[in-house]
């Protein structure tokens, strides 16, 4: 695999690795490419029902929702709510090597 530009993000509300996901969608894997509200909300709902959701974000700033209404500690309540139970990775999908991932 050639060198793809990617970076993992720490997601607030993510379950520990060894915690089994329970729910009717357990075993379903979802790739989320949405930003802001609608797509992430739908994916969050799937994750809440047990699906494994992997959010793909552009390198750099990531989803613009990360910066909406920042609190004093630098986090966004919107981001905390919409990203729960998901894993995130930043990939430059214009790069063929990143597309292979």
Protein language model annotation of sequence segments:
Residues 5-101:
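N-terminal helix-loop segment corresponding to the beta1-alpha1 unit
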